[in-house]
UniProtKB/Swiss-Prot annotation:
Its EC number is 2.3.1.191. NCBIfam families: lipid_A_lpxD, PRK00892.1. Pathway: Bacterial outer membrane biogenesis; LPS lipid A biosynthesis. Keywords: Acyltransferase, Lipid A biosynthesis, Lipid biosynthesis, Lipid metabolism, Repeat, Transferase. Pfam families: Hexapep, LpxD. GO terms for biological process: lipid A biosynthetic process. It comes from the Bacteria. This is UDP-3-O-acylglucosamine N-acyltransferase. SUPFAM superfamilies: Trimeric LpxA-like enzymes. One of its GO terms (cellular component) is membrane. It comes from Sinorhizobium medicae (strain WSM419). CDD domains: LbH_LpxD.
Amino acid sequence: MEKNWFFPPHDGIRLGDLADQIGAELLDATAADRAVRAVAPVYRAKAGDVCYMLSRKSREELQTCSATAIICDKAISSLVPDTIPVLLTAKPHTAFALAGTLLHERAMRPSYNTSERGVSPGAFVDSTARLEAGVEVEPMAVIGAGAEIGSGTRIAAGAMIGPGVRIGRDCTISAGVSILCALIGNNVIIHPGTRIGQDGFGYAPGPTGGMIKIVQVGRVIIQDHVEIGANTTIDRGTMDDTVIGEGTKIDNLVQIGHNVRIGRYCGIVSQVGIAGSAQIGDGVMIGGGVGVNGHTSIGSGAQIAAMSGVASDVPAGERYGGIPARPMRDFLRDVAEMALRSSERQKKKGGKDE
């Protein structure tokens, strides 16, 4: 990659210091004073870069690697050339993530859109809104009546913070975000285009046909350290609250319906749709493109495979997949059986489709 001015390299961290901070062991102590400035993939890592390996599949990439260090576990360390220092750890993925936060702090949150600091004269801040010292508001942002925003929070260009919304400290609200009827904790990151707190989808049959809108008078509660991807939508509750638990990470293009409650430290990948009043426990992982039926429950620690359809409750700690979602062992057995039947059918037809 040619020079990347969006994310310039760090001024330099001693390799020995980096090892200490990411919880890794530097196998070659003589390399401790070398400077690390950036992260890079194995195949093009050069002096000043640190990279990581999780699999032997990357061993061919070592032929073009001249990194200052490679983060890996004991099983992979024997593949690394003697010329490249090893940062040994049982959790290389985690260690690399920590290295990234140290070397590229600027990339950990959406970047500033202007060079201005403070409240831009091009923003509209209602006279009854309360902003603590250190809040930054970029041009064309709107802060509604009675809104409260904590110190260190940045409201990016074109964002709309509705009346009475409360946002905690050290949050990043990116460009084009709209937030209504919501209480947001500290250290929350919301990426561009996300919509929070709009009406949930609820209608009843009309007395003479058509549909009558069901009133939506709940809120959205987003706890501390949540990160929400671009163009995700989170509806407010009907009468209760929609809740996103502490530390949960939500990808781009996720739809979360009214009254949904998501626990702490969950991971939800893009294009997931969670229908109203579903209950998600703590530490749940949901793969891309999953649909979750309304009023269902997914227990803590459960994992849902990508493209699955959750039609009924999932017990805690289970791995489910398929449509309808079922225990992974059953899903894989069903897939194998269907493949076998398809193969047998083709043989009966002489390999010709009809």
